[in-house]
Amino acid sequence: MKRHILLLITCLLMAVVPAQNKASKSIPTVYVDGNGIMRWSDTRKEASFFGVNYTLPFAHAYRAMGYLGIDRKAAIDRDVYHFARLGLNAYRIHIWDVEISDGEGNLLENEHLELLDYLIFKLQERGIRIVITAQTNFGNGYPERNQPTGGFSYDYDKCAVHSDAEAIAAQEKYIAALVRHVNSY
């Protein structure tokens, strides 16, 4: 039970990542008050966000860029430019753990993780806040078939991933490595 609570707390702590670039360290953080309302740390006013769920580093969006022969970083550059131009101040992603982990939950340093780092860096440059769900617990295929990756989530069904001792150990290893990961940008 303590492991589950620790895992939940870790995930919640990662939920809202303050998008601060190196030039601007004074961007306020967000906290949740006693009534469950997100507030800015500097003004105590309610924090509200308008954003997009965007998945180019992973799954079908990643593959689609490959099918079309489009440079993925150039696509991220263009898309983030338009997010900012449209006044979006938030970005959300479910990280496809099946694409950045192995069967034991080790974090894989691969193109998917590198593109996620790049995307986060570009969003931070534009002052766009980032909301991360650390894992998906589903495949990377939609609308196509799932692609085999060797990620731990593929070894357990969606319910067992939350109750099987080996699945929980793999998740703990993955989350710990993800939290310790340093963005290469």
Where in the sequence are the language-model features?
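Hydrophobic h-region of N-terminal signal peptides that target proteins for export
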Residues: 10-18
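Sec-dependent signal peptide recognition
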Residues: 2-8
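Residue-level marker of positions within ordered structural domains that often coincide
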Residues: 6, 15, 57
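Extreme N-termini of proteins with methionine-enriched Sec-type signal peptides or N-terminal signal-anchor
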Residues: 1-2, 19
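Active-site mouth of glycoside hydrolases
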Residues: 25-185
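Low-complexity, Pro/Thr/Ser/Gly/Ala-rich linker/spacer regions in secreted
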Residues: 20-24
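A periodicity- and composition-biased signal for non-globular, repetitive helical segments
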Residues: 8-9, 98
